[in-house]
Amino acid sequence: MRKFVFFVVAILIQIHTTTSQRNRSSSPSGFLDLQLEKCPQVLGCRCVRDSTRNIQCFSIDESKLLEIQKIYGSNIQRLELHNWQHDQLNFDIFAPFPQLEHIILRDGDLESLNGTVIHPTLKVLSIENSELTSSSEVCRLLSIFPKIQSLSLSKNYFEKFECDTSNTKLKILDLSQNRISHLEVPNTLRVLNVSRNRLTSFENISTKLTDLDISFNKLSLWPSFDDWKFPNLRSLSAIKLDLQTGFQLDAPLLNSLNIDGASLRYLNFHQILTPKLKKFSARYLTELRNIAGRLPSTVTDVAFTDTMLRTLPADFIPMSSTNHMQKVSFDFSTNQLLCDKCLLQWSLPVYAQTSIRKDCNLTREEIESASCKIGVVANDTGIQYGKYEKPTAISCFSYGVPSPKISWWRFRPAEKLGSYDPITDEISYTNVSETMKESYEIQSGGSLLIRSPNRSHVERYVCVVENEYGKDYGIYHFRLDYLDWYSYDVFNSVFWGGLATSLIVCLISFLLNITWILTRKSALWWIQRAERLSRVRKMVEAMEKYRVRQMESLHEKYTKRVQIVRDNYHQQVEALRVSYASQQEKFQNYKAAQVDAVHSHLDAMRDGYNNQLGRVREYGSKRAEQLWESYERQVNRMRTFSLQHRLKMMRQYKVKQRYVNKLLESLQATSPEVQLENEEKVRAALEIPDDLATIDGSMDTPSRLSRSSSFHSLPEYVIDEQGNVRPGIIPTNAPSIRFTTKPTTSSISNEASTSSPSSSGAHRSPDSPPEKR
């Protein structure tokens, strides 16, 4: 029973607790936070660290700045803008923010900058990853920023930067990742970053700098001590320098030096005057072969990796207290290390940080206990190689305590090349010929430099070392390395370069041959074409002359035959007229009694005359038709002959119809005088008057002759009652003529006066007596 009571009480307590919690959560304060937001929201902007004085915006323009001023106020100190929406920026739009100290513009398309309003509080200006190209605009802006200290213009498109104004407090300038090849900066600078540009020299770089970054430039020459001293420089970054020798530096306060990835073959610490150097980085120096001098005693971090070094100077790492050596970070790696105990004396201070135990199987005690008074290691070094006509250094792997003096000799011919004293760091060329001085040079550290190796320098070289314990020597063999001739760099490989050159020569010769063949073919084709066209022109002229001659001959024959027919016709008509006139005269003297008989007889005579005249006319017309048809057949035959020969000539000589047409036009072109002369001849032959009227009866100038019936038919003639011959018309029973004559006034009158005897009745003579009814 008690258990049941306790169970019921527990259930009631749980129900009460749940109900009270629901009541609390259902209150308005449980759903709404009535406190004001610390940072108001503007579309595209946010507060950095919930501060209204540090605003970051994305993809905005000038209109959004007014909204920012209204929402966040005018007390903004840092404004960061990403993706500015215009290609121009006028800094006057920031005038409503009098406390603005930092302006950062990133990832925009800015091309132009301007402004006139002075911003007295601005200290930092950064315009990165834009498209600025004019340094003069930037230099003008410095005048409106009197307190500016830092300016960043990285990732733009400057090809030169010229701004050496003195009225500025600018201390930090970042010009990295541009295209700058010429540089002029203010003398007030203390930090300069010109990495990843196109600088080829160190002109106009201030020596008052404390930090300098000149990495990834095309520097081929390093300035000397006299031209380049940095009394205040503390950090220098010269990564990926395109230098092989000549690196030197005078910076007494330098703490950090970085020359990673440089092309240095030789490094002389006697010329690197950095007594306070703490960090030295020389990683990935794949061409480094020799080192001279020693590190400063203050160095704490050293790195030499991926080099071609075979040893280091015995005193390269300074011997100091054990505690100091434990703090030094030393990173050294090479694939050609000489495992000689005396040549490994340099590793004693940093033995624990090297891989000598692994690579050479030597302990520190073994190296330290070795007796190294004097000696030269030459037998284990092998042949030393150098590239053709590229400066190459031959190392003398010597040792001794104290450091021995090194002398170089050429084995054959036996000539002295020079000497080096490591204690005084002096190089001597005593008793050395001028020829040897031109070819060889003694470097600091005792290595022999061959200035421009060729086959004459392939020889044995003797390195003689000497100190208070005696003298020793070693012979080193030098050979030329032709591996570069087969490298994959086409422009630096003899093999691939020769192959590419041969291909280019073959290609050029091929193109020249093709050009010569095409030129020759074109010239021959042009000559053959000229000859062919000349032959065609001559043949066309000959054919045209032949055609014209034949056509003239046909025309003359046709004219003669028509003239013969016409003369025959006139003769017959004249004979009939004479016969008719003589018969008429016989009957004119008869008296009135015989008038009727005479008239009937005259009518019979007239009918006979007309019949004979019709037969003569019909014969002449048929003969003219035959002549015309024969003439047309001969003309068509001549045209067909000319056309066939023309087509044959076009196919044989491969000429176009257009060219032949031009030739024919030039040959057939005759002057108007010749045409008029021909028309006059035709008019004279056909007896056509010059004042021939037109169809409508108006008198105009004589037009050119056209084909008419006079060419193909005979003229009509009749004899009137008086016995005179006059033009007449063709009787209705006459056969049709090929071409009808044009009607004229005279022909119409003749047609009206001429009629058949049967229809008009008897024609009376004016002398005959009147007829009796």
UniProtKB/Swiss-Prot annotation:
Compartments (UniProt record): Membrane
Annotated keywords: Disulfide bond, Glycoprotein, Immunoglobulin domain, Leucine-rich repeat, Membrane, Repeat, Signal, Transmembrane, Transmembrane helix
Extent of Polar residues compositional bias: 733-745
Signal peptide feature range: 1-20
The name this protein goes by in its record: Immunoglobulin domain and leucine-rich repeat-containing protein 2
Cellular component GO terms held in the UniProt record: membrane
Extracellular side: 21-493
Disulfide bonds: 396-463
Membrane topology: Single-pass type I membrane protein
Compositional bias segments (type: Low complexity): 746-763
Name of the coding gene: iglr-2
Cytoplasmic side: 515-773
Glycosylation: residue positions: 114, 204, 361, 379
Transmembrane segments: 494-514
Biased composition range(s): Basic and acidic residues: 764-773
Residue stretches of each LRR repeat: 52-73, 74-96, 97-120, 122-144, 145-167, 168-191, 206-230, 233-251, 252-275, 296-319
UniProt keyword annotation of Glycosyltransferase present: no
Annotated stretches, region: Disordered: 725-773
The keyword Cell membrane is annotated on this UniProt entry: no
Domain Ig-like: 349-479
